[in-house]
UniProtKB/Swiss-Prot annotation:
The keyword Ribosomal protein applies. InterPro entries: Ribosomal_uL16 (IPR047873), Ribosomal_uL16_CS_euk_arc (IPR018255), Ribosomal_uL16_dom (IPR016180), Ribosomal_uL16_euk_arch (IPR001197), Ribosomal_uL16_sf (IPR036920). This is Large ribosomal subunit protein uL16. SUPFAM superfamilies: Ribosomal protein L16p/L10e. It comes from Dictyostelium discoideum (Social amoeba). Pfam families: Ribosomal_L16 (PF00252). The gene is rpl10. NCBIfam families: PRK04199.1-4, uL16_euk_arch. CDD domains: Ribosomal_L16_L10e.
Length: 217
């Protein structure tokens, strides 16, 4: 029996049903990589941030998310190089889909029970997304804007419903606007923290404050 089309599971109809000790035998999600590209790049290297945002409340299958990730990664790697960006998948397929299998061969009516005991068996996983929720985020250099927008446009064809591409006003994956980030950087109050930054505040001991300022500069 083939895989049931994802259009059968597009809408969020019931409560979330996740893997647990009561829900066993769930097949692994097709997507295994949620962070790709140059993950260790500092915040100063990739100031531009672009998001792919959902415009509908729906369910995205793990197969669709993986297809979108591959499509996006392939285009940017080909046009700008595999070290020219850092991409994050911002949704996770936690919700478990069920299927009540029916036999369709000759003599099946003597073997199956119809809708008696119709609670199905796990068949796959999906991510439940809301209106305005971010699906993919990419940080990169300013001159890569056109390439990133095109990559996200191509990946959006892998998903049902409508999506929009938004160029963020924030600096990379940080929580600060460009002006605020550059001001904090000029004041020497930012410490690198992976793909993000930590702001040195006027709290704590003087010794710790001096240590943080020295590390930032």
């Amino acid at each position: 029996m083939g895989r049931r089309p994802a259009r059968c599971y597009r809408y969020c109809k019931n409560k979330p049903y996740i893997k647990s000790r009561y829900c066993r035998g769930v097949p692994d999600a097709k997507i295994r990589i949620f962070d790709l590209g140059r993950k260790k790049a500092s915040t100063d290297e990739f100031p531009l941030c672009v998001h792919l945002i959902s415009l509908e409340k729906e369910q995205l299958s793990s197969e669709a998310i993986e297809a979108g990730r591959i499509s996006c990664n392939k285009y940017i790697s080909k046009t700008g190089g595999k070290d020219s960006f850092h991409m994050r998948v911002r949704v996770h397929p936690w919700h478990v889909l069920r299927i009540n299998k029916m036999l369709s061969c000759a003599g099946a009516d003597r073997l199956q029970t119809g809708m008696r005991g119709a609670f199905g068996k796990p068949m796959g996983t999906v991510a439940r997304v809301n209106i305005g929720q971010i699906i993919f985020s990419i940080r990169t250099r300013d001159n890569m804007l056109a390439n990133v927008v095109e990559a996200l446009r191509r990946s959006s064809y892998k998903f049902p419903g409508r999506q929009k591409i938004v160029v963020s006003k924030k600096w990379g994956f940080t929580a600060y606007n460009r002006e605020a980030y550059q001001k904090l950087k000029a004041d020497g109050r930012l410490m690198n923290d992976g793909a993000n930054v930590k702001v040195i505040t006027n709290h704590g001991t003087l010794a710790q404050y001096a240590k943080d300022i020295a590390a930032a500069n």
